[in-house]
């Protein structure tokens, strides 16, 4: 097994291309699962183990927030945000998504279907526990892909709104065919290739987040190429089916984000079937916005957004295209 240390996703692809250029040409699209293939429900009974869910319960809850972490992270990402929201009346349920945290096999891609099925199961369970409480989805990066893909696949889910924090989306990516070919080639020819991802977050994230990514053994550091490919195809699925997400969405994106492009977020917002999508941007936000030093300010804005939705203000007002996307 080959192991190399690289700074991030772009470096991963660069190493991949160097390793595979002499091996073979990119396979035809038919040799791998097309990103747009409709996701099917996994068999019933695939229960979520209790130790995969962390809960912070509000004393008098006004709503439930189901939180979905980013790629390589786990439910402990919300050890600060969870109790902070609970103190303000929002019960939080954070899930170790499959292959992450306590979910085994750690670091292996389970497929899009199980991730989507888990989100649907979380929503349905929360509704069964308290049918009168609105449910919000909060997803960061890969978690944003999972949240959006789940609602696109299961439009019957009753969700009051989605907070998509730098979600994994791929609309408007320049030379996407080239990157797709690179990812497909790696997935097919070198799926077991392991690359070490160990970015330095010290200048962009809060100290607790820096410590977690540096020392927490539950963080995925050695990333398999087929796992990385699965994250990409999940993002593509969410992008291809974004027009089926009817719940109100607020998209957050920062200019310091080296992973997601603003145009990808803006295209998703424009595609909302009811015009109920907002885009917030900030010059200083990194990719992991909710783990930046000013995360409480951002969280307060999200609470305000949820309160506006609860008061029907968003649904009642005239749809408008978000200003950050008018450039």
Stretches found by the model and what they are:
Residues 247, 261-270:
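Short alpha-helix in the alpha/beta-hydrolase fold that links the catalytic acid
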Residues 17-57, 324-327:
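An N-terminal hydrophobic leader/cap segment in hydrolases
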């Amino acid at each position: 097994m080959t192991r190399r240390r690289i700074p991030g996703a772009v470096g991963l692809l660069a190493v991949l291309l160097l390793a595979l250029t002499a091996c073979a040409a990119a396979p035809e699209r038919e040799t791998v699962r097309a990103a747009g293939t409709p996701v099917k429900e996994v068999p019933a009974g695939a229960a979520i183990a209790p130790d995969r869910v962390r809960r912070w319960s509000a004393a008098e809850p006004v709503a439930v927030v189901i939180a979905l972490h980013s790629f390589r992270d786990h439910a402990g990402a919300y050890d600060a945000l969870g109790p902070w929201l609970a103190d303000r009346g929002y019960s939080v349920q954070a899930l170790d998504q499959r292959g992450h945290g306590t979910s085994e096999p750690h670091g292996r891609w389970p497929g899009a279907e199980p991730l989507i099925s888990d989100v649907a199961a979380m929503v349905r369970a929360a509704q069964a526990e308290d049918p009168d409480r609105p449910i919000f989805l909060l997803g960061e990066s890969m978690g944003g892909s999972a949240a959006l893909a789940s609602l696109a696949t299961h439009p019957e889910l009753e969700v009051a709104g989605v907070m998509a924090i730098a979600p994994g989306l791929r609309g408007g990516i320049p030379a996407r065919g080239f990157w797709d070919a690179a990812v497909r080639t790696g997935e097919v020819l070198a799926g077991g290739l392991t690359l070490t991802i160990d970015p330095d977050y010290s200048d962009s994230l809060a100290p607790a987040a820096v410590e977690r990514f540096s020392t927490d053994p539950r963080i995925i550091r050695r990333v398999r190429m087929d796992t990385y490919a699965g994250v990409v195809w999940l993002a593509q699925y969410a992008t291809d089916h974004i027009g089926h997400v009817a719940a109100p969405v607020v998209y957050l994106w920062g200019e310091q984000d080296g992973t997601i492009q603003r145009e990808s977020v803006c295209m998703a917002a424009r595609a909302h079937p009811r015009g109920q999508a907002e885009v917030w941007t900030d010059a200083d936000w990194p990719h992991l916005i909710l783990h930046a030093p000013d995360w409480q300010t951002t969280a307060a804005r999200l609470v305000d957004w949820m309160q506006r939705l609860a008061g029907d203000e968003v649904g009642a007002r005239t749809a408008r295209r978000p200003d950050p996307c008018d450039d």
